[in-house]
C-alpha cells in the first residue's frame, strides 16, 4: 500500500470507510505439544510458555533434566519455516511479546542484541529450518515425534490435523493458549485503485457480505476457523472442529 500511495498519491487499500479491510475468519496462534511432553514440562516449570520452551531448548541434559524420559533425547521445537509461512514470523513476535512482557512490539525490540541472543538459543531447538515445511501441523500427523515435541502453530491447522494425529499416534497432542496471543484474521480488502470502477468495488463488497453471512461463517468452523461474524459462536454446528 505504501509504494502505491507514493506513486499514485493515495491509498489503494483503506483502513476506514465502506471499502475498508475486514476480517473474514480468525485463527489464533497456540501451543500444540504432545501430552507426555507437556506433562513433563508442566511438572518441572508449572506452565507452558516461551520462557519454559527457552529453558527446555537450552537444557544440556535433555529431557531427563526436564522431567522426561532419556529416550526422548533433547527437546525439539516446531515452528513454521518463516521463509515459507508467515506463522514462523508470528511465532517470533509472540516470543518477543512474552520476553518483554507487553503487546506493543517494535522493530527496535526485535533487533535488540539481548533479545536476538535469547531468540537464537530458543530457535536452536528447531531441528532443521531448511527442511521444515510450510504446514508443520500436517507434519505432526504424518511423522509424529520425528518432527518435534511441540511448538506454536495456527489453531486451525492443529484442529484440522488433530484426527490424523490421534489416529496414528498413541500420544495425543494438547493445545495450550499463550499469555500473549498472536492471530491471523484473513482480511478481505477492496482494491480502490484508479483502474477499478464503482461497479467492480460494489461487486467485491457483495462478495464480502456473502463470506460474512451466517451460513458461510458456520462453514468455516469445519476448518477450525473462528468466525469473524460475532453472531456465530464456535460451537454453532455439529461439524465444528471446536466441539469434536
Residue ranges and their predicted role:
Residues 1, 30-33, 75-79, 87, ...:
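Structural recognition of the beta-strand scaffold that forms the well-ordered cores
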Residues 17-31, 116-126, 130-133, 167-196, ...:
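Periplasmic-binding protein-like
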Residues 5-9, 33-37, 58, 95-104, ...:
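Sec-exported extracytoplasmic/periplasmic mature domains
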Residues 1-73, 81-84:
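N-terminal segment of the mature folded domain
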Residues 189-244:
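Extracellular/periplasmic juxtamembrane helices and adjacent flexible linkers that interface
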Residues 36-43, 84, 97-106, 194-204:
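Short helix-loop capping/hinge motifs at secondary-structure junctions, enriched
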Residues 1-4, 27, 49-53, 87-91, ...:
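Stable alpha-helical elements in mature extracytoplasmic
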Amino acid at each position: 500500500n505504501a509504494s502505491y500511495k507514493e506513486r499514485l498519491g493515495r491509498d489503494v487499500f483503506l483502513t476506514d470507510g465502506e471499502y475498508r479491510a475486514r476480517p473474514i475468519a480468525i485463527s489464533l496462534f497456540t501451543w500444540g505439544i504432545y501430552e507426555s511432553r507437556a506433562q513433563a514440562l508442566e511438572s518441572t516449570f508449572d506452565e507452558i510458555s516461551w520462557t519454559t520452551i527457552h529453558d527446555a531448548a537450552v537444557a544440556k541434559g535433555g529431557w531427563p533434566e526436564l522431567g522426561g524420559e532419556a529416550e526422548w533425547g533433547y527437546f525439539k521445537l516446531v515452528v513454521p519455516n518463516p521463509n515459507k509461512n508467515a506463522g514462523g514470523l508470528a511465532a517470533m513476535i509472540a516470543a518477543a511479546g512474552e520476553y518483554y512482557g507487553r503487546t506493543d512490539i517494535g522493530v527496535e525490540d526485535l533487533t535488540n542484541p539481548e533479545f536476538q541472543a535469547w531468540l537464537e538459543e530458543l530457535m536452536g531447538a528447531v531441528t532443521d529450518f531448511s527442511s521444515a515445511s510450510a504446514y508443520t501441523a500436517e507434519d505432526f500427523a504424518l511423522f509424529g515425534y520425528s518432527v518435534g515435541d511441540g511448538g506454536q502453530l495456527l489453531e486451525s491447522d492443529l484442529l484440522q490435523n488433530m484426527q490424523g494425529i490421534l489416529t496414528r499416534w498413541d500420544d495425543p497432542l494438547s493445545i495450550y493458549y499463550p499469555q500473549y496471543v498472536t492471530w491471523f484474521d484473513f482480511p478481505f480488502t477492496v482494491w480502490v485503485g484508479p483502474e477499478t470502477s464503482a461497479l467492480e468495488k460494489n461487486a467485491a463488497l457483495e462478495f464480502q457480505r456473502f463470506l460474512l453471512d451466517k451460513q458461510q461463517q458456520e462453514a468455516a468452523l469445519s476448518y477450525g476457523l473462528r468466525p469473524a461474524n460475532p453472531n456465530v459462536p464456535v460451537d454453532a454446528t455439529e461439524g465444528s472442529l471446536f466441539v469434536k
